[in-house]
Amino acid sequence: MAKRATRARPGRGRFITFEGGEGSGKSTQIQLLAERLKGQGIETLVTREPGGSPGAEIVRHLLLSGVGKLLGADAETLLFAAARDDHVHQVIEPALKKGVWVLCDRFTDSTAAYQGAAGKVDAAFIEALTHATIGDLEPDLTLILDVPVAVGLHRAIKRRGKAVADRFEQESLSFHESLRDAYRKIAADNPKRCAVVDANADAATVSERIWETMQHRLASALPARARA
């Protein structure tokens, strides 16, 4: 499989991923950022993982229903990789090539955190799968929304209402603590790509923190009026 460039080329869109544990506010913040970018005249696509393409959405249903857990951690990781392969080929890469900015709710760091650090799947196995499916594609910026585990789980319960908790919301408190630690380590190991955003605040405050990070990290790609 051909390697993909990790740095944005002239005319190519920017790839921004949102990461974080349950209830970190990713879904809200990704929409707020998309609206802000569109207001600056930047064509933007919001997508998610697992899912984002017809084939990947089928896999998403299987994964969140708990089927992956029945098959075991390694098999679950394979399902995530299969969904991501379809998503990247069908949605993400075509959009980036057209100059569209892609905002994705979860990407490879979720696999490293959920299946790797918290699920104990071998890191080398995950890395090999990643290179086999999507090559060297990496986000231009990864925003890791950080909240205390108790806060995040409370938000998730409130958001869910009477609906049944999904596969990952049902995990133990120690699992979610491991997730938070894993994301912090990912950020520390990849400081040029990742930015940790304190998301333990109201949505408007977190949105401003994200925009300030965008202005700092992707200033050259933003219109002049957006840098002020």
From Swiss-Prot:
* Listed EC numbers: 2.7.4.9
Q: Which InterPro entries match?
A: P-loop_NTPase, Thymidylate_kin-like_dom, Thymidylate_kin_CS, Thymidylate_kinase
An MF annotation (GO) of this entry: dTMP kinase activity
Question: How would you classify this enzyme at the top EC level?
Answer: transferase
Q: Which reaction does it catalyse?
A: dTMP + ATP = dTDP + ADP
- In this chain, ATP is annotated as bound at 20-27
Q: Which UniProt keywords apply?
A: ATP-binding, Kinase, Nucleotide biosynthesis, Nucleotide-binding, Transferase
For the keyword NAD, the answer is no
Q: What does this protein do?
A: Phosphorylation of dTMP to form dTDP in both de novo and salvage pathways of dTTP synthesis.
What the entry lists under PANTHER family is as follows: THYMIDYLATE KINASE (PTHR10344), UMP-CMP KINASE 2, MITOCHONDRIAL (PTHR10344:SF4)
Family according to the record:
Belongs to the thymidylate kinase family.
- Name recorded for this polypeptide: Thymidylate kinase
Q: Which organism is it from?
A: Afipia carboxidovorans (strain ATCC 49405 / DSM 1227 / KCTC 32145 / OM5)
